[in-house]
Amino acid sequence: MARAPSPAKSISMAIVVIGGHSRSVGKTSVVAGLIAALPEYHWTALKITQYGHGVCSLNGESCHCATDDHSWAISEEKDRSGESDTSRFLIAGAVRALWVRTEQGRLAEAVPTIRLRLAESENAILESNSILKFVRPDLYLTVLDRATADFKRSAQEFLDQADAVILHAPKEDRPGWTGISLKPVASRPIFHIHPPEYVTKEIAEFVRMKVSSDLKPKA
């Protein structure tokens, strides 16, 4: 699948996207780990969540409001308690953390505002698979865990676009998922992790090298 067009951005800006094949595989921990390991990039961090029907995009709670009223929302995190994912981003060192909530299938409606937020950023790191339909990052990493059977369609769709794989060290020889081939990333770097460590020195250096090679000095 062809990559989405890149948003208008500063020539000295980098966009990193962290995806994964299911919930609870460590995407948020990888984002927070990279922010902490690479503070010199002054990250703006975005977490993108798509909800099912009957859940309000304004606050993530169940509701019966008109779909067109609350199809998406973006809020900026201010709390540093560490209780939410975006709060963890701030604690890790992000200069700004944003939570994007949309109804399933309606992410496109939030994209113009997302692009504006990206344009305001020095560098950006996003937690999402589906954003790849609309944004072309400088680097895309996917987090995989053989012990988790679920494999999102969005993760399958963009697997071949991953620049590298962050793979939980196998607890079993056979992956929990079925009907999924990792051939699209067979030639890509694979970094094994052992939680609670989600970002190794090798991962941080790989990201630094890739991001630095794409950055151009400011005019």
Question: Which residues are covered by each model-predicted region?
Answer:
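Intrinsic disorder/low-complexity segments
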Residues: 1-10, 217-218
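Extreme N-terminal starter segment of soluble prokaryotic enzymes
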Residues: 11-16
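Conserved beta-strand elements of the Class I
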Residues: 17, 42-46, 142
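Glycine-rich phosphate-binding P-loop
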Residues: 17-34
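N-terminal phosphate/diphosphate-binding loop that engages ATP/GTP or pyrophosphate donors
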Residues: 35-102
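Active-site rim loops that border cofactor/substrate pockets in soluble metabolic enzymes
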Residues: 72, 95-120
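Conserved catalytic-core segment of NTP-binding enzymes
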Residues: 116-123, 128-210
